[in-house]
């Protein structure tokens, strides 16, 4: 991610400010400089806020970012443009605020744009989704962004000096290692659940074992006495338990079957005796009822005689009924014949009236034909009547418009001639403008060279003066140094090494005597007197130390002056006095003014000519358009004339309205005539068809009447023959028999019921006699008592068997469940053993007492330290290396960092480093952290890094090394920005972003040293 442009409104001390990072060439190192409180860090806050809605430091809240001097009606907003993977994006974030005069807060806004084909297209327009889009785009969240892109105040060395728990929190955020802690918790819960399930399964086994029925059997009680924790013993006893239960069930079943057989015997005997008793009673009752039924025999015989006579007279009755129907049909046919004759007469009358109407209509035929001819000839005119009507309406307008267009065209042609006369032979001369611009540029360059040379000469004189002054100081100090060295050489340095040996010599003297052998030199001791003046030796030694101290101080001063002379010489060598023009500044300025005036005059002339050409082109275009409109007008006018001529020729009318009225009237008359003619023809056709239908109906009715008369004659003959057969003389005999027909159904039912019951009694008496023949009836009370006794015994044994069978089956189910639980328990213990071991290892119960998360974080920390040591070795002149403290305890340590001093070959606490050494280590670790996070985050594009940390703790050499390190970052393609107050950085870093404050608001500008 590389910043391109930053725009701030009411943000911190910036009311309205823009920073153009595109002025930074080739990712060069640049310095952000300004007084304390001017708003340097706010630049970092703005970038972080624009992307994530947060400041670059955690301590600053969003409400703290709004300027105190902002207009109450204006929002705080940041617009940030940046480049990522060769694509350009822009984000605009507006903070929430309460607008002056309102009581409710105006919500925050956030828009994300991407440049496509030179234009920004919106990608997101909501705060939450937009921020998530940026996180996914950059591949980092706000915390990771602070570690990768911006190293803010107070957090620069936080990672270096933090303890394991604090580092764990930082590394968790950067490497998303909480998932490993989540795995540990999941495994812990899983183990807890599994152990609970295992314990629950033991309880279920115990509960099932206790619920097994013993049937009060000593063998089963002995088997059930085993403890349920002895699952192997349970498996061994279960088959024995099931076998004994089956034996008990078989014994009960045998007693039950015996009782059932005894009950079935007495039940069968009781049932047979009850059936015999019922049959005897039924037989006696049926015999009595059968005698009573036979008493109805004479009545039934009379009914049968009546029914026979009714059956014989049926044919005669049918003939009589048929005679009545035929007589009715004859009467109806006569009525139909009369009605049909009347209808035919009416139809003949209607036809005569319609014939008269037809004759009257045919008398107007010639007039109608002439109207039809007119309609056919002018139909095409009427269908397009609007076209002809419009021609009459437009012809005058088109004549007037044509005359007006002709006049306007003539005026435009005259105007074009005037413009062409103004242009004449003049042409735009842009080459002359380029030539004058080049001349002006050259003159400006010569003027700048003269000014720069004057400034360089003044700087050179100043540096030469400083150099001469330093050389004079060195000469003076060199002379003093020589005198001190001569004085030092003149001192007697003998016996100086005995100055601190006085006590040692006294001890030796007290331990030896004259004549003894000296323990030092081995010679015989001749004298024990004082041969050495220790006071004189101490005095000479102090004087020598003082001279040596002065010599060392003077040498240090000379070295400092030599370093300063070297620095001055470097500055002198960097001063470049360029070759300049022989002309004076006054002459060059005069020439510059002349050329600028000539340039302005030529620009005015070119502008005038271009305006005239533009006006000429405009007039030419207008003339062309007018000519087109005039041509169009003439074409439309000709078309109108042709249409009017066509209309008047075909219609013989010169008025559209009159033509329309007459045409519509003719069409109406023709349509009415044709409709009336068709209506008359339709009526005649209908009358003809109706008369034909009625004539057919009349013939049909007459034929029917003849048929009915013949049928009536034949039916009368049949009646006479049937009465003769039945010996009936008149209609009274027939009426008496007909009266019986109302009772026929009742008589038939009574006869049939008698015959049916008679047959049923015969059958039932025969059946019951066969069932009771040769059978003896037993005592019912005795049978009932014996039946109840056997039934009670059987039910008791059935209930006992059901209970024992259920308990046996229940025992089998429970033992099967126990076996299933035991098998599952054994398999579960086997399967979960690896999970238990894994949970212990992940939870820190291992040889290093490390949780899985800390193991992963240690791996990442080792990589970070290895990357950091590559730079720290250079910055510390191969003295220091960062190392991870190996001590671990219950997974909460192992992330502390110590420093290894290669000079002493020992490691020590990080707090033992000086301020400058701490800065070196912090910078190296921060850069290493940045690179490792980039690698682990899918190759985040780190094209820039900003450091907000003081460099004041560094000495000259360390500062140079730190700058070299940051310059190396530039060579890897990163833009590097630094906030610092160190004056040396202002001299070393050529590009400075100055932040100035007037106590009200701040402003920025880029400048080069």
Curated annotation (Swiss-Prot):
Coiled-coil zones: 176-364, 392-502, 535-802
Family, similarity comment: Belongs to the SMC family. SbcC subfamily.
CDD domains in UniProt: ABC_sbcCD
UniProt gene name: sbcC
Binding positions (ATP): 34-41
Keywords noted in UniProt: ATP-binding, Coiled coil, DNA recombination, DNA replication, Endonuclease, Exonuclease, Hydrolase, Nuclease, Nucleotide-binding
A GO BP entry: double-strand break repair
Species of provenance: Staphylococcus aureus (strain MSSA476)
Pfam families linked: AAA_23 (PF13476), SbcC_Walker_B (PF13558)
UniProt cross-references to InterPro entries, sorted A to Z: P-loop_NTPase, Rad50/SbcC_AAA, SbcCD_Nuclease_C
This protein's name: Nuclease SbcCD subunit C
GO molecular function, one term: ATP hydrolysis activity
């Amino acid at each position: 991610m590389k910043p391109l442009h930053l725009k701030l409104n009411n943000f911190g001390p910036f009311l309205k400010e823009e920073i153009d990072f595109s002025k930074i060439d080739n990712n060069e190192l640049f310095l952000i400089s300004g007084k304390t409180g001017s708003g340097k860090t706010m630049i970092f806050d703005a970038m972080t806020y624009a992307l994530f809605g947060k400041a670059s430091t955690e301590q600053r809240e969003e409400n703290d970012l709004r300027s105190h001097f902002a207009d109450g009606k204006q929002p705080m907003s940041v617009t940030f443009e940046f480049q990522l993977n060769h694509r350009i994006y822009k984000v605009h974030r507006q903070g929430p605020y309460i607008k002056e005069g309102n009581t409710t807060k105006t919500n925050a806004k956030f828009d994300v744009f991407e440049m496509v084909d030179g234009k920004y297209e919106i990608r997101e327009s909501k705060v939450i989704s937009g921020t998530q889009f940026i996180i996914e785009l950059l591949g980092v969240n706000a915390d990771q962004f602070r570690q990768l892109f911006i190293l803010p105040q107070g957090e620069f060395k936080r990672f270096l000096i933090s303890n394991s728990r604090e580092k764990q929190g930082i590394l968790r955020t950067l490497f998303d290692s909480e998932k490993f802690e989540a795995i540990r918790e999941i495994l812990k819960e899983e183990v807890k659940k599994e152990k609970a399930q295992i314990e629950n399964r033991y309880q279920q086994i115990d509960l099932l074992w206790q619920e097994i029925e013993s049937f009060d059997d000593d063998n089963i009680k002995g088997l059930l006495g085993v403890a349920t924790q002895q699952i192997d013993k349970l498996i061994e006893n279960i088959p024995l338990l099931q076998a004994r239960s089956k034996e008990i069930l078989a014994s009960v079943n045998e007693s039950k079957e015996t009782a059932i057989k005894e009950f079935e015997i007495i039940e069968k005997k009781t049932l047979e005796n009850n059936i015999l008793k019922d049959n005897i009673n039924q037989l006696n009752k049926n015999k009595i009822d059968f005698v009573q039924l036979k008493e109805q025999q004479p009545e039934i015989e009379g009914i049968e005689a009546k029914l026979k006579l009714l059956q014989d007279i049926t044919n005669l009755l049918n003939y009589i009924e048929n005679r009545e129907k035929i007589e009715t049909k004859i009467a109806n046919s006569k009525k139909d014949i009369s009605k049909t004759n009347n209808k035919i007469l009416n139809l003949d009358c209607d036809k005569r009236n319609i014939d008269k109407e037809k004759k009257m209509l045919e008398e107007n035929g010639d007039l109608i034909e002439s109207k039809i001819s007119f309609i056919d000839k002018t139909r095409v005119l009427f269908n397009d009547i609007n076209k002809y009507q419009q021609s009459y309406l437009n012809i005058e307008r088109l004549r007037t418009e044509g005359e007006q267009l002709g006049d306007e065209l003539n005026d435009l042609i005259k105007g074009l001639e005037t413009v062409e006369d103004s242009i004449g032979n003049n042409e735009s001369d842009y080459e002359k403008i380029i030539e004058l611009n080049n001349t002006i540029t050259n003159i400006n360059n010569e003027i700048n060279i003269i000014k720069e040379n004057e400034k360089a000469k003044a700087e050179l004189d100043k540096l030469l003066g400083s150099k001469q002054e330093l050389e004079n100081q060195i000469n003076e100090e060199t002379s003093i140094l020589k005198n001190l060295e001569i004085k030092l050489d003149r001192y007697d340095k003998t016996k100086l090494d005995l100055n601190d040996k006085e006590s040692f010599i006294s001890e030796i003297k007290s331990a030896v005597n004259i004549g003894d052998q000296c323990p030092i030199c081995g010679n015989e001791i001749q004298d024990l007197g004082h041969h050495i003046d220790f006071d004189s030796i101490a005095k000479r030694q102090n004087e020598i130390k003082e001279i040596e101290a002065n010599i060392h101080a003077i040498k240090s001063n000379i070295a400092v002056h030599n370093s300063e002379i070297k620095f001055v010489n470097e500055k002198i060598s960097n001063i470049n006095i360029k070759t300049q023009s022989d002309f004076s500044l006054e002459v060059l300025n005069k020439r510059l003014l002349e050329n600028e005036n000539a340039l302005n005059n030529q620009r005015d002339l070119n502008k005038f000519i271009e305006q005239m050409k533009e006006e000429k082109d405009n007039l030419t275009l207008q003339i062309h358009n007018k000519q087109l409109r005039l041509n169009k007008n003439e074409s439309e006018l000709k078309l109108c004339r042709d249409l009017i001529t066509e209309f008047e020729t075909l219609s013989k009318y010169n008025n559209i309205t009159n033509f329309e009225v007459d045409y519509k009237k003719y069409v109406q008359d023709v349509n009415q005539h044709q409709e009336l003619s068709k209506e008359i023809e339709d009526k005649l056709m209908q009358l003809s068809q109706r008369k034909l239908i009625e004539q057919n109906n009349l013939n049909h009715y007459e034929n029917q009447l003849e048929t009915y008369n013949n049928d009536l004659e034949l039916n009368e003959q049949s009646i006479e023959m049937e009465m003769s057969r039945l010996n009936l003389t008149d209609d009274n005999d027939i009426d008496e028999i007909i009266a019986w027909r109302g009772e026929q159904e009742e008589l038939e039912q009574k006869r049939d019921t008698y015959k049916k019951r008679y047959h049923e009694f015969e059958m039932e008496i025969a059946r019951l006699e066969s069932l009771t023949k040769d059978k003896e009836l037993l005592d019912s009370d005795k049978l009932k008592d014996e039946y109840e006794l056997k039934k009670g015994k059987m039910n008791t044994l059935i209930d006992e068997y059901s209970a024992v069978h259920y308990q046996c089956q229940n025992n089998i189910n429970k033992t099967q469940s126990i076996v299933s639980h035991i098998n599952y328990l054994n398999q579960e213990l086997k399967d979960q053993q690896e999970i238990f071991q894994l949970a212990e290892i992940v939870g820190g119960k291992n040889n290093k007492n490390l949780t899985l998360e800390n193991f992963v974080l240690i791996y990442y920390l080792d990589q970070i330290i290895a990357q950091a040591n590559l730079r720290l070795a250079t910055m510390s002149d191969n003295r220091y290396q960062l190392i991870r403290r190996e001590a671990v305890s219950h997974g909460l340590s192992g992330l502390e960092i110590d420093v290894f001093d290669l000079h002493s070959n020992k490691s020590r606490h990080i707090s033992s480093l000086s301020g400058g050494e701490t800065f070196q280590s912090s910078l190296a670790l921060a850069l290493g952290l940045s690179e490792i996070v980039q690698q682990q985050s899918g190759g985040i594009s780190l094209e820039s890094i900003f450091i907000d940390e003081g460099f004041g703790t560094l000495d000259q050499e360390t500062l140079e090394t730190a700058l070299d390190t940051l310059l190396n970052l530039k060579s890897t393609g990163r833009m590097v920005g630094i906030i610092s107050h160190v004056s040396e950085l202002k001299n070393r870093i050529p590009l400075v972003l100055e932040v100035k404050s007037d106590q009200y608001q701040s402003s920025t500008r880029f400048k080069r040293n």
